[in-house]
Amino acid sequence: NEIRAKVTTDVATGAGTFDVVTVGMYEVPLWAALGWIDEVGPTLDASPEYDSADFFDSIRDGLSLDGKLYAAPFYGESSSMFYRTDLFEEAGLMMPERPTWDEIAGFAEALHDPDNEQYGICLRGLPGWGEQGAPLGTVINTFGGRWYDADWNAQITSPETTEAIKFYIDLVTNYGQPGAVSSGFTECQTLFLQGNTAMWYDATSPSDVNFDINQNPFADRIAIAFAPTKVKEPSGWLWAWAFALESVSENKEAAYKFMEWATSKDYPQLVADSTGSWGGVPSGSRASLYENPGYAEFGAPFNPVVLQSLAEVDPLNATNYDDTPYQGIQFVQIPEFQDLGNRCTQEFAGAMAGSQSADDAIAKCQGYAEDVAIEGGYK
């Protein structure tokens, strides 16, 4: 949340505090269209060793505008379900390779033991379009919901979207971690690494840490499944953290040298050699990493799910409808969504905390979304 706000302010005002900024798939096409960041593909590819064609198509496409690359991907991710195999075995439960959300809810109830600080599932409750909003967005999609219909009428109060939001709130409230509204990615990962949660639905990117016995004492007792579904399949998100070059930068040559080095084919091997482990390398962006014998061996427990998830996502048609007017899986790719997502997730956090009902939170979000459609000229 903090880096997004700081970078957005700097780029939008042309302050030029930074030369290189860390951005994601939501910002890149929007900022490229506004001329805030430079096209970087031709300069990076001027180096014969760089090979931007090595980036996964879904990652490259998400960081491009009109086929031109505007940010160099550091790592990429979809979403998945991590779980403790030992706890499942003890309870006589079996996680399917592709679970449904109804199955996940049943598992969470069965494995929830708060008296012993073991929680059924950890889900992000921290407000923020890229925090709580990311996993919640995939739940909305797979339940058959969406933010807007073809005519840009807000759909938050539609039966499908309402069901998805209430399901998410109920799941984390009844069988999730305490203080969920303060839990983002980092907090949930900490709980998972400490052995306090039986399941964790989040990005595929922490697989490298989760399955590294040097960083996770439970690494030999976990497994990974595909993102859960209900109606729409598949349901994983798509994201990449990438380096973009501010158009107002006065140090572009140095900036390019950094981007080329940090997103090169050789960088993951450098990290592994420097740390003595593959558990800290940036993954999910370059195909060549998965051809590296060392990483292929390390990632054998999770690479098949990660690679298949990245291959099957469709940000152009993430909902259960053919006429959805926006692009994006866990976000709506319009400039106003950053504020809209933040405001709505704040309301949903209020419902999680018990300060208002889920119905009231949903109604408020519906109003915010309608205002955006009208004031933004979409409707």
Predicted regions and their residues:
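Conserved C-terminal helix/tail region of periplasmic/extracytoplasmic solute-binding proteins
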Residues: 89, 313-379
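Extracytoplasmic/periplasmic solute-binding protein
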Residues: 65-74, 79, 103-154, 166, ...
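A structural signal for short loop-to-beta-strand junctions that line the ligand-binding cleft
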Residues: 9-10, 16-19, 48-87, 119, ...
